[in-house]
Design a protein with these regions (language model features):
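Residue position within the beta-strands of beta-propeller blades
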Residues: 51, 88-89, 137, 178, ...
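Short coil/turn segments that connect the beta-strands within blades of beta-propeller domains
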Residues: 46-47, 83-84, 132-133, 172-174, ...
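Asp-box/BNR beta-propeller loop motif
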Residues: 56-68, 73, 100-118, 146-158, ...
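Short, solvent-exposed loop/turn segments at conserved positions within beta-propeller repeat blades
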Residues: 35, 95-101, 138-141, 178-179, ...
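Short coil/turn segments at the loop-to-beta-strand junctions that recur within blades
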Residues: 71-77, 120-125, 160-166, 199-204, ...
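Beta-strand-rich domains and repeat architectures in extracellular enzymes and scaffolds
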Residues: 31-58, 77-78
C-alpha cells in the first residue's frame, strides 16, 4: 500500500496527513506508486504530472505508474517552477557528494539534471512557491519563511511561517495571496504588510495562474478574476480535495487517494489514478 500526501489545515511549514493509495503491478518501463517508500507531493508542470518522492522525481505515465525523471534520485521536498526552470529542495540521494540539505537547486532540462543555486547545506525547503522571479520557501529546520526576488539567488527571512499556502502573482513582483487560518491575506510588498480579503469561504489551497486565482474550499473548486474579492464555484468533488496544482495546460486535484486532472480550466475533471 502506498501513501499519498495531503495538505493539513494546521498552521506550520508544511504538514501532511497521510492517505493510503493502492498500488498496481509493475510494467516493463515504469515503476508504480507502490514502489516508492514515501510520496511528498504531486504537482503539474506544463502537461506532465510529477510525483515528488523520497527516491527521486517521477512522472506519472499511466494509472499508478511512474517513471524516474533523470538519474539523480534526490529526496525531493519543496518544488516549483519559474517559466521553464524547475526548482527543488530536499536531500541528496544515497552516495551523492551533494551536501545535506541540498539548499535550492535548479534544472533547465525538465529535471534531468540539477545545479546548486543557493543555501547549499543550510536550508531544507519543504514548501516552495514562485512566479516571475519571486520565490517563497518555508525552511523545515528553522520554521521560517524566506523570500527571494531574484529567482532564488539571494534570500531574506520573513520570520516564522504562519501560512499554509501562498499564491504568487505572475504579473507583479512582491504581490501574493496567502492562506492563514483559512482566510486570505493579500500583500503587495512581499509580506512586509498584508490586507485581509473579506470572504465567507474558508480556503485550504490557492493557485495563481495568469490573471485568475483558483482555490479549494470545502469540497469545491473556485475561481476568482478580481484578486480574490469574489469567487465562482466551477467544480464540486465527492470528498474533500487535498492538493491543487495548476499549469497553463493542466489542472490537478487530489481527493483522498485519487488524482484528477482537467484540461478545460477546471470545468470538468478526469480521474487518472
Amino acid at each position: 500500500m502506498k501513501k499519498l500526501p495531503r495538505y493539513s489545515s494546521l498552521v506550520g511549514v508544511l504538514i501532511f496527513a497521510i492517505i493510503v493509495l493502492p498500488g498496481i503491478n509493475n510494467s516493463a518501463n515504469a515503476e508504480t506508486l507502490n514502489s516508492v517508500s514515501h510520496i511528498h507531493h504531486v504537482k503539474v508542470i506544463e502537461n506532465k504530472v510529477l510525483v515528488l518522492t523520497h527516491e527521486g522525481l517521477f512522472e506519472l505515465v499511466g494509472k499508478d505508474e511512474i517513471k524516474l525523471v533523470g538519474k539523480d534520485k534526490l529526496d525531493v521536498m519543496g518544488f516549483t517552477s519559474l517559466g521553464k526552470a524547475l526548482f527543488a529542495s530536499g536531500h541528496p540521494s544515497e552516495g551523492s557528494k551533494m551536501p545535506n540539505p541540498i539548499g535550492l537547486v535548479k534544472s533547465i532540462d525538465g529535471g534531468l539534471s540539477w545545479k546548486a543555486v543557493s543555501l547549499v547545506g543550510k536550508v531544507d525547503f519543504h514548501f516552495l512557491e514562485g512566479a516571475g522571479s519571486d520565490l517563497y520557501g518555508a525552511d523545515s529546520q528553522t520554521g521560517n519563511l524566506l523570500y527571494s526576488a531574484d529567482s532564488g539567488v539571494t534570500w531574506r527571512s520573513l520570520g516564522a511561517n504562519t501560512f499554509t499556502d501562498i499564491a504568487v502573482s505572475p504579473e507583479m513582483s512582491g504581490m501574493a495571496i496567502a492562506i492563514k487560518n483559512s482566510d486570505l491575506l493579500l500583500t503587495e510588498n512581499a509580506f512586509k504588510s498584508t490586507t485581509k480579503i473579506k470572504n465567507a469561504l474558508k480556503f485550504t489551497q490557492i493557485e495563481w495562474r495568469n490573471s485568475a486565482l483558483y482555490a479549494l474550499s470545502g469540497s469545491s473548486l473556485y475561481k476568482s478574476t478580481n484578486s480574490g474579492k469574489t469567487w465562482t464555484k466551477i467544480s464540486t468533488f465527492k470528498g474533500v480535495p487535498g492538493i491543487l496544482s495548476i499549469s497553463d495546460q493542466l489542472m490537478l486535484v487530489t481527493v483522498g487517494s485519487d488524482i484528477y486532472t482537467s484540461k478545460n480550466e477546471g470545468k470538468s475533471f478526469k480521474k487518472i489514478s
